[in-house]
Amino acid sequence: MAIEYATRHRSASRIPADPGKPYFIEKGEGDRAHLFGDLITVYAGGEQTENTFNFFTVEGPKGDLIPAHVHADTHEVFYVTQGAVRLFVEDTEGEQQERLLTPGDFGFVPKNCTHAYRMERHHSQVVGVAAGPGGTFERFFENLGAPTGQHGLPHQPLIPEPHKWGTVPERYDVTFLPDHQWRTR
């Protein structure tokens, strides 16, 4: 049985809000959110780490490219644990790369580098870690998407309401680049 905590972000969270306190979370029992066709589970966020990093998983179906975006202050890690994920990156000099990551593969995206990804197999899963001086962005997922109590993928993709696209990303160091073109394929 999981313990629930009230935090400033959620009325019921599986993560204790007190920084500096050890805790344990069973598989899948973090703070869950649906965004697009994905299930995001946050295990540690800014509240626990004094805004030094976050730790989350993203599980999704084979599908569309997550839109190109950039973080001005946040470095991001992609570590694939299940399936396959294609990671697209563009460095600050404009050089583009893409790589198919399979279980055990790792990708690092420094701040200010445009990136996107696509799940290449059903039920692919990525462990994400993000860190930066301005705080962490784990609450982005539930604010652009929606918190959920479900353990699985959404039955229908959760497409954000249009008004959220203008306010939510900027609060969490996410800038979408809708006109960005990937020249790698």
Provide a role label for each language-model segment.
Residues 138-155:
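A hydrophobic, small-residue-rich beta->alpha segment in the mid-to-C-terminal subdomain
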Residues 103, 111-138:
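Ligand-binding loop in jelly-roll beta-barrel domains
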Residues 73-86, 90:
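Glycine- and acidic-residue-biased ligand/ion/polar-headgroup-sensing regions
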Residues 48, 52, 91-111:
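Short acidic-glycine-tyrosine-enriched beta hairpin
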Residues 64, 85-86, 91-95, 175:
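Hydrophobic small-molecule pocket/channel-lining residues, especially in calycin-type beta-barrels
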Residues 1-53, 155, 159-185:
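A short, N-terminal "cap"/entry segment at the start of jelly-roll beta-barrel domains
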Residues 44-46, 67-72, 89, 97-99, ...:
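Short histidine-centered beta-strand/loop micro-motifs
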Residues 65-67, 86, 97, 105-116:
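Histidine-centered metal-chelating micro-motifs
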